Amino acid sequence: KSLSYQGLWRLINPVLKSGLTKRLMGIHPERSVPGLAPPAYMKAYENGYSVESAAGHERAVILWVDEFTQANDPLLVGKACDVLGALGYIPAVVCSPSGRAAISGGFLPESKKIAQKTLKKLQNSTKTLQNAPILGLEASAVLSAIDEYGRLLPDEKVWISSQRIATLDK
């Protein structure tokens, strides 16, 4: 039986935070390294705040969760859902990578694939939720969609610019 991410994160975190790993990666010994979060957190948010459960609500909002937030700070997703709910919105959690690391690293073919997959997921969500605004928690992920996706996918540039995409702090 293979080891799933459910158990793997428990093994990876001590290795990520070890002095040897920091030295190999060129990280200062006193600097902290964020660990991977338990995957059960994200499953709970995805199940509790699905696009389907928000369908038909006038005040539905798509909460786009990028790969960094998903892996390192899923509790932030719960807090954001609480804030949106307190403001009278119905959050719909959509988890999909931004491709920011691939874009920054110059891996354009991979970046394009990630952008296509993420845009398709967001487009399907906005159709289901009658053009609900898209909020992101990680500014660099949102800026990737706004600035870079149009360059990577010229045919989608009009759709991207017509959407209400912002970070939660805007």
Model features per residue range: what roles?
Residues 1-170:
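Iron-sulfur cluster-binding electron-transfer modules in prokaryotic oxidoreductases
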